[in-house]
Amino acid sequence: MAGNSIGQLFRVTTFGESHGTALGCIVDGVPPGLPLTQADLQVDLDRRKPGTSRYTTQRREPDQVRILSGVFNGVTTGTSIGLLIENTDQRSQDYSEIKDVFRPGHADYTYEQKYGLRDYRGGGRSSARETAMRVAAGAIAKKYLKQKFGIEVKGYLSQLGPISCELVDWSIVETNPFFCPDPSRLDALDEYMRALKKEGNSIGAKVTVVAEGVPAGLGEPVFDRLDADLAHALMSINAVKGVEIGDGFDVVTLKGTENRDEITKEGFSSNHAGGVLGGISSGQPIIAHIALKPTSSITIAGKTLNRQGEEVDMITKGRHDPCVGIRAVPIAEAMMAIVLLDHALRQRGQCGDVIPPLMQW
């Protein structure tokens, strides 16, 4: 299987399956001298891990990460950083009934068609369990970006089903299980999720991720444009079916006079572009949105085929998230941070001596 790595100078390679022995990753390109401990990574892993609220899967994984290499005396050495998380709460028997049946809306059918076989236990490599390692690697990127470049990456749930969540207060995002920035929507979210769970159904969501403090100049036209790489990274997250940068698809209804981000001596008058112009960061906040589909692992019967080509009805058993978007916030942050650090290092390597002719606001 190819496609397990992302990045050029800052490069992340993950391995492992949902019900395998462990998950792991190799992080290459971390400059030496960055103070780094397990606790630095655990903060974001705890934000992503399952079983933390009634609104997420009840699979209980501690997700305790181990740093195997690349750190000595509490600082990075510049060599490859090896990370490992052991799986401890697998219930493979929950999936024994689907080993010969293709769950609709899942990767079962496509993996079998591509490889001729599949690990049916929790989806194997296609499971979102893999994203734990992205979050661990992303925590390294987030720390370096903040310490060395003053860049901060953070995200929030901006919509769950029909309920929109406006950015009212960043400070409350980490105080509720939805990562919602609007306190007036918490009761509605709770009521909606309770009804959804009773129904045995699932729902989609929208997550917004923002990077502040990004300098102008990141991005490598034409094929490694910053927005192109961000879209690629965010689209690689399980269940993501759409990515928007800035105003995204809303620009279809805008006129040029409305969409252009005019420039004055005080700076940009707006940020419809989401902080990227011509594939290069403008110095404004980078803003991206992702749309996540509702999981097909629900307790309502649906039609599918088995390996013999026979039509069957099936109900997915096991422990699943009724809304995968809730736990996607730290994953989206991680993917944006990985891309930004890769481009920051590339910019420093090629254009580190360039003096911008204009000030950055």
Curated annotation (Swiss-Prot):
NCBIfam families: aroC, PRK05382.1. Pfam families: Chorismate_synt. The gene is aroC. NADP(+) binds at residues 48, 54. FMN binds at residues 125-127, 238-239, 278, 293-297, 319. Homotetramer. It is an enzyme of class 4 (lyase). HAMAP family: Chorismate_synth. Keywords: Amino-acid biosynthesis, Aromatic amino acid biosynthesis, FAD, Flavoprotein, FMN, Lyase, NADP. Its cofactor is FMNH2. InterPro entries: Chorismate_synth (IPR000453), Chorismate_synth_AroC_sf (IPR035904), Chorismate_synthase_CS (IPR020541). Pathway: Metabolic intermediate biosynthesis; chorismate biosynthesis; chorismate from D-erythrose 4-phosphate and phosphoenolpyruvate: step 7/7. It catalyses: 5-O-(1-carboxyvinyl)-3-phosphoshikimate = chorismate + phosphate. One of its GO terms (molecular function) is chorismate synthase activity. GO terms for biological process: amino acid biosynthetic process; aromatic amino acid family biosynthetic process; chorismate biosynthetic process. This reaction introduces a second double bond into the aromatic ring system. It comes from Proteus mirabilis (strain HI4320). This is Chorismate synthase. GO terms for cellular component: cytosol. Belongs to the chorismate synthase family. Reduced FMN (FMNH(2)).
